[in-house]
């Protein structure tokens, strides 16, 4: 059986503010922003080159029952972490120092406006279509 990870819900306090951060600061692509029913909003954003998206919204248990800021360490894999950090800093994102943990693996951390944390990850041996 084959399965694909499609969506990771991200709990936020203000959908518009979070959407702006992910699209304008992190460069995610807006795939969906719909209000399919009264009191329900679904926003789906995808990092460029990724098959998996993040979701945020209101009026659904996946969004309303999780406390904002509780997602920790969602990994964003990049080919060149120094370049990615420089680009994000240039867009006004606070990014922690790059940490080389050995074995060709490097990490850097950042947070969205609600305190959900994201981890930039570079694995020098995992490039191209493999990451």
Q: Could you describe each region identified by the protein language model?
A:
Residues 3, 7, 32-34, 41-44, ...:
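Vicinal oxygen chelate
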Residues 29-69, 117-124:
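Conserved short beta-strand elements that form part of the metal-binding/catalytic scaffold
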Residues 21, 82-87:
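Short amphipathic alpha-helices within nucleic acid-binding modules
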Residues 10, 74-79:
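Short, well-ordered beta-strand elements within core beta-sheets of diverse protein domains
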Residues 2-3, 10-52, 90:
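Core segments of cupin and vicinal oxygen chelate
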Residues 14-15, 79-82:
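Helix N-cap motif at beta-to-alpha junctions
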């Amino acid at each position: 059986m084959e399965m694909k990870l499609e969506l990771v819900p991200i709990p936020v306090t203000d959908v518009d503010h979070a959407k702006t951060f992910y699209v304008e600061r992190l460069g995610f692509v807006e795939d969906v922003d719909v209000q399919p029913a009264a009191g329900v909003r679904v926003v789906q954003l995808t990092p460029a080159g990724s098959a998996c998206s993040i979701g945020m919204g209101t009026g659904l248990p996946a969004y309303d029952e999780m406390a904002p800021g509780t997602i920790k360490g969602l990994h964003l894999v990049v080919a060149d972490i120094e370049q990615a950090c420089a680009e994000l800093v240039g867009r006004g994102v606070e990014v922690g120092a790059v940490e080389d943990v050995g074995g060709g693996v490097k990490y850097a951390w950042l947070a969205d406006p609600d305190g959900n944390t994201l981890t930039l990850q570079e694995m020098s041996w995992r490039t191209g279509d493999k990451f």
